[in-house]
From Swiss-Prot:
<feature type="region of interest" description="Disordered">
    <location>
        <begin position="1188"/>
        <end position="1218"/>
    </location>
</feature>
<keyword id="KW-0539">Nucleus</keyword>
<feature type="compositionally biased region" description="Polar residues">
    <location>
        <begin position="1629"/>
        <end position="1640"/>
    </location>
</feature>
<feature type="compositionally biased region" description="Low complexity">
    <location>
        <begin position="726"/>
        <end position="744"/>
    </location>
</feature>
<feature type="compositionally biased region" description="Low complexity">
    <location>
        <begin position="1276"/>
        <end position="1319"/>
    </location>
</feature>
<feature type="compositionally biased region" description="Basic and acidic residues">
    <location>
        <begin position="643"/>
        <end position="665"/>
    </location>
</feature>
<comment type="subunit">
    <text>Component of the Mediator complex.</text>
</comment>
<dbReference type="GO" id="GO:0045944">
    <property type="term" value="P:positive regulation of transcription by RNA polymerase II"/>
</dbReference>
<feature type="compositionally biased region" description="Low complexity">
    <location>
        <begin position="1004"/>
        <end position="1014"/>
    </location>
</feature>
<dbReference type="InterPro" id="IPR051999">
    <property type="entry name" value="Mediator_complex_subunit_1"/>
</dbReference>
<feature type="region of interest" description="Disordered">
    <location>
        <begin position="1"/>
        <end position="24"/>
    </location>
</feature>
<dbReference type="GO" id="GO:0003712">
    <property type="term" value="F:transcription coregulator activity"/>
</dbReference>
<feature type="region of interest" description="Disordered">
    <location>
        <begin position="643"/>
        <end position="785"/>
    </location>
</feature>
<feature type="region of interest" description="Disordered">
    <location>
        <begin position="1455"/>
        <end position="1510"/>
    </location>
</feature>
<dbReference type="Pfam" id="PF10744">
    <property type="entry name" value="Med1"/>
</dbReference>
<dbReference type="GO" id="GO:0016592">
    <property type="term" value="C:mediator complex"/>
</dbReference>
<feature type="region of interest" description="Disordered">
    <location>
        <begin position="1269"/>
        <end position="1401"/>
    </location>
</feature>
Length: 1760
């Protein structure tokens, strides 16, 4: 209690104190102080008052002024007294007093303050719910006051009045509105308005206000009251006429849609109270979406009236100058047609007003339309225009307006996310389409309205379609994971009635164009163009229905791609018919190879062009069933009834084609297990009997038989009915004279179903080529595929994988390698792939001769010989294989000699086509430029895909035609850069004959060096000789010994995967030739070579000297890498082959070694100087299009040479160890970079292991430059390699007779300009050279192995960073083809180093010191753009002849020393190599593996066909590439429809091949032949960022525009059309197609390499996003392949090293500094790299259309 009490006391005291302080005792204290007397207070005294008062008395007054204290105290006292006397008043009284005092107007109120006060009161009023009459009156009073009207209250109701009208509102006693009547001055009586009644009854005062405004606006005229009276009269007269017209139109247009879109006025709503008449003329489906129900609301007039949807105009009257306006209705109905009476005095009056159509929302209108509208209305008054938007580009204006200003730069991509697709749209501005924003349109007569609405409706439709590409959900655009699945589109408008959308065909390596014809708004027509031809009517109808239902471009394009996908799946299920019409112009890419042993010199027939048809072997008169068959699944193709010979051909596998049989019999192919043959025969028979009697399948399975049987018979067996297949596998081999390669293929291990699917597409691609090729080849020995890769333990489950793989490979099946993906384990289980080397009798010699034959020979001789040996021979006994190989060699040699005799003038077209079939580019495979190339795979990477050394073999064969020499030769230049027939036949295994020297070299050494020689020969006789000599002496010499050893090893290890080192070497030369000819072609040549072109030649450390036994070499690149491999491999090559074979090999290697890191460790240890060098060219390297070869020449060149060119000139072009030659050029550059890195890593290790003399030998090969780096200590290698590089390029250019740039590959000089870097024939601008250098780089590298000059050009292109500077010297060096092999080596080395800037980066890994020099050079061009170029971004474009042309001839390849790191590393043994291969392969696969598009896969034809590269790309290649590629392709290859890519239709393939000449597949069948240069080179064709895209990765050229528009698709649809149409006419287009193919194939691979290298090299996401995406794809692929972290790390390290090298940074990781002996075959990569994605700048654009929910709903409505 005490405590409580104390608390209370304290509380009391506190209160007392506070009250005192507050003044409770203040008055008393003040008074006390003031008066000196204590004052009595009425308040109860407070304890401590005195003290408090005294204490505070002096302080509180403040200053202590007594006077102030007195005043306050007196006042307080007065108040107290007053309150006391008056007693306290009530609150009401007080409040009233306050109010009265406030109302006293003592001060004048400020007008502003008064208005603000009124606004505040009004705002408060709006928040008060009207529940009584008084509340209603107050609210209406507030509204009317704001509108300037008067409100008066009467007993009966309320009146709202103005000077011209008044409203009477009748209320009941409760305040409920009963009626509202409107009375206008001009009217005699009031009119009841139900609209106003309803809005007041429901308390909608906002609407009531709007109606009052509408009524008041009628009279807002500057005139007297008596004049203004007529305003409402005139407006009513107009409304009467309009409604009468609408009533008439409803009789003619029964349904709401036609009424809305076709009737004169649309849907008309009469005036409702104060609401003006509304005309709705267009409604977008987006406005009808019911997001909750996920459906579309039914369109009807009630919905239009109830909801404010669509585009509409209100009919109003507004003040203006004086006009004569009607005061009476003018519409008179005469019959069924309305007639307007003229305006006269009696029916009109003059008013200072005009009628106006006020748009419900501002609209962007075309200025041309606005002028027409003004013309209609007589321009009585200016249309209301937003001055800020006057005369700006219409599309930009639409995008800005639709995005609410969030998107200001349409150069950035506009990202749209659909339920299952991710799109990026680039708007290509048309300067002729100027626009402005309008909000109203004045008019004076009723007939004007319908005419004005025609334009507004057209504009609304146009705006709606473009607006459908704009979204608010742009945040997702920045997610890199989306880039993998991103599909890029370019939207352009020729006028407001035509919108064109360009995209990359997902399945046909081409650009597709979708044209929206908006003239008939009710029935929009969509036309789809693929490969220059309009798609069938069915597709157009389906797409038209979708766009009519959705009015959305993204949803429509999604439906189109779904249709393509369905067709593609049906095709590969054998349900579809491949309808290819092979024409001589389109398909005649198979040049007569010269009379084969058993055949005459018939003119090359059109048979080569269509993959679907079968070409007659001996007669060259094979007619292709389909010109576009390359992209068609052969299984889908229904072959015409065949005569007996045709049937026989159909039954026999291409591997068993007569040529193959011959070669086999000669080469001992007869020794092939009969069981295998029988099995194969049965399989082939079954296949052929099946719906898919695709040449590919039948040929593959039957080819082995036929080749065996024919060989036994000694007479050329008719090519299997599957011409393309035969040409790819059998014919390619045959043309190579390696038909035995095909025969040697072990088809027994192949799954017939897989074969069927894979072959079908290959057949399609190769049928045309193969048959003509087969004719020639049949006479020549045909080589069975050396390698058969069959997934083991896979049931039918492989079908899906097979389909994908086959799709990729189908275009480009190579006889050399059969990779059959196991359903589920394509890449999982290394063991699931059996790689059986099949000994090829005359691997070297045959390869040579076959290289003379169009790409087929090239393929079969090197790739086919070695690869086929591998594949088929593995099952056969070693002795049989050896015997066969020897026989094949002899036959090849004979064939080559025959070819030389037959050489004659070069076939320009054939040259390209040659490349096409064998090389990755689509044209070769499409056309039987080289009857053999498709078979042999030299032209079509598929045949070369065979893991065995066959790839080199085929490379050799195709090499002559494709070899830099060929390309270099003026002839070759004349014809699409491969004008010389040698070029054509050799490089493409087409009609060109190898030079005698080449033949001699091929003949002299069956070893790889011989093959190299042959490939060198391919370009031109003397150049071949030179090249061959150069190759022999510098690279070929080593290569020869390697080749011999390889051969021996192949024989010994026939069952092993290793192919002949010689074969790989040879294939690389061949690849070179194609690569040189066209980078794409190079890829094709490498096709087999390129795809498989990277031959992992296991240079056994056991092997003496530089040429460790070459038998270890595995030519996986061609078909495996590019999916161009023969039969299955070719299809799978791009995805399955690369991923499966590479993956399996890599996995095997990993399993054997435990991991890639283990292999690398071994390699590193090998770097220590281990004598044994395992030149393991990872799949990446193969993809990059180089074969790993151990050159035995210790002094001259590195013991191991990587014929990068062999794998794919285009890929090589990517200039890394061309590991990335996966997709020809497309994957090639990225892949090459990665591969180069890997290869460099391995190579450095291998070099260290070998401890061979440190020398770099560069051999120009037809495909590119072959770098042989022999580095005892690693320091030496740098200088050596650089010297070799320059030497190689010199020799190459000199020999070919063409400028180095021309020699740089299949690309004709014209195309070469873009890849000027090839031989340096074309002086490149710094930027262009850099860009072209990316492509050149590959070619240069491959040329080092095969052809000297071509690849050197390519090499220059290849060296991304140093390509510009390097190229110059390289090309110069190329010119001296006759230089000693050392010189050649130097030239090659220079070219190679320059061209392989990326490779250099990889090389730098291998040889840090050597790489440093190259890196320094590379650093010059090391900027992001250069890096991209080096990576092959530019290569891809450069692959096209046009691009090649633009390349700087003088471009110098960085010294090999810098690049040597990029070359492959050597490993302890063949198994290691295989392991590395597998590892590398997965890596390369990874580089572009994520792209499932078959378009990524290399086409069988090779790099020529733009569409082919995608087909060739590994199936795993990320869609990003394809997505990006479409833009690039659009720009680069306007002719190549994406649809081509998408469907790989035979026509497309064929066309693209022929069109490729321009560097663009011709979409329209005739396109300007202007090559699309990367950027600088071919700016005219593709001035838009598209150029950059076409160089997708060519950052150097595109750096300026790359940042802003790298991702942009080409902006010249018209140019594309012209290019396409022009290309179609050109058979040379094959080369271009090849180049395009190469580009395609390169882009994924190069994207990989670029991704790896560029990711680190480039800081600009805009430029590097594509790389990043590619890199991501690569990593995905790696993880998918279950690559160990070590492998990934190794890959990344390699990439980093490559990046540093290319950037001119440190040479590379110390561990990889110096390979003992590295042979880098750098091939030109024609394939364009994927477009770099912009940072998603456009993604943020907001769209008026709406978000994902709306898109998803609309997708559901679209019906697709």
């Amino acid at each position: 209690m005490s405590s409580i009490h104390s608390k209370v006391v304290i509380g009391e005291k506190r209160r007392e104190m506070s009250s005192t302080a507050a003044g409770g005792s203040l008055p008393a204290s003040i008074m006390a102080n003031g008066s000196g007397k204590p004052i009595k207070m009425e308040m109860k005294p407070i304890v401590g008052t005195t003290a408090a008062g005294k204490g505070h008395g002096g302080l509180l007054p403040g200053s202590g002024d007594k006077h102030e204290s007195w005043q306050m105290e007196l006042l307080m006292e007065r108040l107290r007294n007053k309150a006391k006397s008056s007693q306290y008043k009530s609150f009401q009284e007080m409040s009233k007093a306050v109010r009265m005092s406030l109302l006293e107007k003592r001060y004048a109120l400020d007008a502003v303050e008064k208005s603000n006060l009124q606004k505040t009161l009004d705002s408060m009023q709006y928040c008060i719910k009207v529940t009584s009459r008084q509340g209603l009156v107050e609210r209406l009073d507030c509204l009317t006051r704001q509108l300037g009207l008067k409100l008066s209250e009467d007993t009966s109701g309320l009146f709202i009045s103005s000077d011209m009208f008044y409203l009477e509102i009748i209320l009941d006693p409760n305040g409920t509105v009963q009626d509202v009547k409107v009375h206008h001055e001009c009217k005699m009586k009031q009119q009841s308005c139900s609209e106003l009644v309803s809005c007041l009854q429901r308390g909608d005062f906002v609407d009531f206000t709007t109606q009052l405004e509408g009524l008041a606006s009628i009279y807002q005229l500057n005139a007297e009251k008596k004049i203004k009276v007529n305003a409402f009269v005139a407006l009513q007269a107009l409304e009467t006429d309009l409604y009468n017209l609408y009533t008439l139109s409803t009789q003619h247009y029964n349904d709401i849609h036609s009424l809305l879109l076709k009737s004169p006025l649309g849907v008309v709503q009469k005036r409702r109270g104060g609401h003006a008449m509304k005309l709705t003329y267009y409604i977008a489906p987006y406005d009808l979406l019911d997001l909750e129900a996920r459906k579309m609301k039914p369109l009807n007039t009630e919905l239009i009236s109830a909801e404010k949807i669509g585009y509409s105009v209100a009919v109003n009257l507004e003040a203006s100058t004086a006009n004569k306006l009607q005061i009476q209705p003018l519409l008179v109905q005469q019959g069924n047609s309305p007639v307007y009476s003229p305006i006269e005095k009696h029916n009109s009056t003059s008013l200072p007003a005009t009628f106006v159509l006020r748009l419900n929302k501002p609209m962007a209108l075309n200025v041309a339309m606005l002028k027409q509208i003004k013309h209609i209305t007589g321009d009585s008054s200016a249309v209301t225009i937003d001055p800020a938007t006057s005369n700006t580009c219409l599309m930009s204006l639409i995008v800005q307006h639709a995005s609410n200003g969030t998107v200001n730069n349409i150069a950035k991509g506009l990202f749209v996310t659909l339920p299952d697709q991710y799109h990026c749209y680039y708007m290509t501005e048309n300067k002729n389409l100027q626009g402005t924003i309008i909000s109203s349109i004045p008019f004076t007569e009723p007939q004007h309205v319908s005419k004005i609405l025609v334009f507004l409706r057209q504009q609304a439709l146009f705006n709606q379609l473009l607006t459908s590409c704009i979204r608010n959900n742009g945040s997702s655009s920045t997610r890199m994971s989306d880039y993998e699945h991103l599909v890029v589109f370019e939207v352009a408008a020729l006028s407001c009635q035509y919108i064109t959308v360009s995209l990359e065909h997902p399945f046909e390596e081409s650009i597709a164009m979708v044209e929206f014809d908006l003239r008939n708004i009710l029935a929009i027509q969509v036309r789809v163009f693929c490969n220059g031809y309009e798609s069938d009517e069915r597709i157009s109808k389906q797409v038209s229905l979708i766009v009519q239902r959705t009015m959305s471009i993204p949803v429509t394009l999604r439906g189109l791609m779904k249709i393509w996908q369905e067709d593609y799946e049906v095709k590969f299920k054998g349900q579809g018919n491949g309808g290819g019409n092979g024409t001589v112009d389109e398909g005649n890419f198979s040049l007569s190879m010269g009379p084969d042993e058993g055949g005459g010199n018939g003119p090359a027939g059109p048979g080569g062009g269509g993959g679907g048809g079968s070409a007659m072997n001996g007669q060259h008169n094979g007619s292709l069933n389909g010109s576009g068959m390359e992209f068609c699944d052969v299984k889908k193709v229904k072959l015409e009834p065949m005569d007996q010979s045709k049937k026989r051909r159909g039954v026999e596998d291409f591997c068993r084609s007569p040529k193959s049989s011959k070669v086999e019999s000669e080469g001992g192919n007869e020794a092939m297990d009969e069981e295998d043959d029988d099995d194969e025969y049965d399989e082939s028979t079954n296949l052929s009997s099946g719906d898919s009697n695709s040449l590919g399948e039948n040929q593959q399975t039957n080819a082995g038989q036929s080749s065996s049987s024919t060989a036994a018979m000694g007479a050329p067996a008719p090519v299997s009915t599957v011409g393309p297949r035969n040409s790819v596998s059998g014919n390619a081999s045959e043309s190579s004279g390696n038909s035995s390669i095909l025969g040697s293929l072990d088809f027994s291990s192949l799954d017939p179903d897989l074969m069927r699917s894979s072959n079908s597409s290959d057949l399609d691609d190769t049928t045309e080529v193969s048959e003509p090729e087969v004719k020639v080849k049949s006479e020549e020995p045909s080589y069975a595929t050396s390698v058969s890769i069959t997934p083991i333990g896979v049931g039918k489950s492989t079908s899906s994988l097979t389909n994908s793989v086959l799709n990729n490979i189908g275009l480009d099946k190579r006889p050399g390698i059969e990779i059959i993906p196991l359903a589920n384990a394509g890449t999982n289980v290394p063991s699931s792939i059996t790689i059986t080397p099949i000994p090829m009798g005359s691997s070297g010699g045959s390869l040579k001769s076959s290289s003379d034959n169009s790409g087929d020979k090239k393929l079969s001789s090197s790739s086919s010989g070695s690869i086929h040996r591998k594949s088929g021979s593995s099952s056969s006994s070693s002795e049989s294989d050896r015997a066969k190989l020897e026989k094949k060699k002899k036959r090849r040699h004979e064939e080559q000699l025959a070819q030389l005799q037959q050489m004659g003038p070069p076939h320009k077209i054939l040259s390209k086509s040659t490349d096409g079939p064998a090389s990755p580019s689509g044209s070769s495979r499409k056309f039987s430029v080289s009857p053999v190339p498709l078979k042999s795979g030299s032209g079509s990477s598929s045949s070369q895909i065979f893991l065995s050394s066959g790839s080199p073999g085929s490379g050799s064969k195709s090499s002559p035609k494709h070899s830099p020499v060929h390309h270099s030769s003026p002839k070759h230049q004349g014809s699409y850069g491969t004008s010389s027939p040698k070029h054509i036949s050799g490089g493409s295994s087409g009609g060109g004959k190898p030079s005698m020297s080449a033949l001699k070299s091929a003949t002299s050494s069956g070893s790889p060096s011989s093959k190299n020689g042959s490939s060198g020969i391919g370009g031109s006789g003397k150049e071949e000789g030179s090249s061959g000599s150069g190759s022999k002496s510098s690279g070929s010499g080593g290569s020869s010994s390697s080749r011999d050893r390889d051969r021996d090893r192949d024989r010994d290890r026939g069952e092993k995967r290793s192919g002949y080192s010689s074969s790989s070497s040879s294939s690389s030369p061949k690849l070179k030739t194609p690569a040189v000819k066209l980078k794409q072609l190079d890829l094709t040549n490498c096709g087999s070579t390129v795809s498989a072109g990277v031959q992992l030649e296991l240079m056994n450390s056991n092997s003496s000297g530089g040429s460790s036994s070459g038998s270890g070499s595995i030519d996986l690149t061609d078909s495996a890498l590019f999916g161009i491999g023969a039969t299955d491999l070719s299809k799978n090559a791009s995805a399955a082959a690369a991923s499966a074979a590479g993956m399996l090999l890599l996995q095997q290697a990993m399993k054997r070694k435990g991991s890639l890191s283990a292999v690398i460790d071994k390699l590193k240890s090998a770097q220590g100087g281990d004598e044994s060098s395992l030149m393991l060219l990872p799949e990446l390297a193969q993809q990059a299009g180089f074969s790993l070869k151990d050159a035995s020449t210790p002094g001259k060149t590195a013991s191991s040479s990587l014929p990068v060119a062999s794998s794919s000139s285009a890929s090589s072009s990517t200039s890394s160890t061309s590991v990335s030659n996966l997709t020809g050029a497309s994957l090639g550059s990225a892949s090459a970079a990665a591969a180069a890195a890997l290869a460099a890593h391995f190579s450095s290790a291998a070099a260290a292991m070998q401890g061979k003399t440190s020398e770099y030998m560069v051999k120009p090969s037809s495909d590119g430059i072959k770098l042989t780096i022999q580095n005892k200590k690693g320091s030496k290698s740098g200088s050596s390699s650089s010297s070799t590089s320059s030497s190689s390029s010199k020799s190459s250019s000199s020999k070919s007779g063409t400028k180095p740039s021309i020699s740089s590959g299949s690309l004709p000089p014209k195309k070469l300009p873009s890849s000027q870097s090839f031989s340096g024939a074309y002086p490149p601008t710094s930027g262009s050279s850099s860009s072209s250098s990316g492509k050149s780089f590959s070619s240069g590298s491959s040329s080092s192995s095969s052809s000297k000059a071509p690849f050197q050009k390519s090499s220059s292109s290849g060296s991304l960073s140093s390509s510009g500077s390097s190229m110059r010297p390289s090309s110069k060096s190329s010119t001296s083809s006759s230089g000693s092999s050392k010189d050649k080596s130097r030239s090659s080395s220079k070219s190679s180093s320059s061209s392989s800037a990326a490779a250099a980066a990889a090389s730098s890994l291998m040889a840090t010191n050597a790489a440093m020099a190259a890196a320094a050079q590379a650093a010059v061009n090391a900027n992001a753009l250069n890096v991209m170029k080096m990576l092959g971004l530019t290569s891809s474009i450069q692959n096209m002849e046009g691009f090649v042309k633009t390349l700087d001839t003088k471009f110098q390849i960085p010294k090999l020393s810098a690049r040597s790191g990029g070359s492959s590393g050597s490993g302890p043994g063949g198994s290691d190599i295989e392991k590395l291969k597998q590892e590398s392969r997965p890596l390369s696969s990874s580089s572009a593996p994520t792209t499932p598009l078959s378009n990524v896969g290399q086409s069988p034809t090779g790099s020529n066909d733009f569409s082919l590269p995608f087909n060739k790309l590994p199936g795993d290649v990320s869609p990003l590439h394809s997505t990006l590629l479409p833009n690039v392709m659009q720009k680069m290859f306007s002719g190549h429809d994406t649809s081509m890519l998408m469907r790989r239709s035979p026509n497309l393939d064929h066309q693209s091949s022929s069109n490729s000449r321009d560097g663009f597949s011709s979409i329209y069948g005739k396109g300007s032949t202007t090559p699309t240069t990367p950027t600088g080179s071919v700016p005219p064709p593709f001035p838009s960022p598209g150029n950059v895209q076409s160089h997708a990765m060519d950052f150097s050229n595109s750096s300026d525009s790359a940042d802003a528009s790298l991702m942009r698709p080409p902006s010249r649809p018209s140019s594309t059309m012209s290019n396409h149409s022009s290309s179609d006419k050109l058979i040379d287009a094959t080369t271009n197609s090849n180049s395009m193919d190469g580009l395609r194939s390169t882009s994924p691979a190069q994207a990989l390499a670029a991704a790896a290298v560029a990711a680190q090299l480039m800081n600009k996401l805009d430029n590097t996003q594509q790389f990043v995406a590619a890199l991501k794809n690569h990593h995905h692929h790696l993880s998918a392949l279950s690559l160990s972290n070590a492998a990934a790390v190794a890959a990344s390290q390699l990439a980093a090293a490559a990046a540093s090298a290319s950037s001119g940074g440190s040479a590379g990781p110390g561990p990889v500094t110096s390979p003992t002996s590295v042979s880098v075959h750098i091939m030109k990569s024609p394939v364009p790299s994927p477009l770099p994605l912009h940072g998603g700048g456009g993604a943020a654009s907001s769209s008026s259309v709406g978000g994902p929910d709306e898109d998803e709903t609309l997708v559901g409505v679209s019906g697709k």
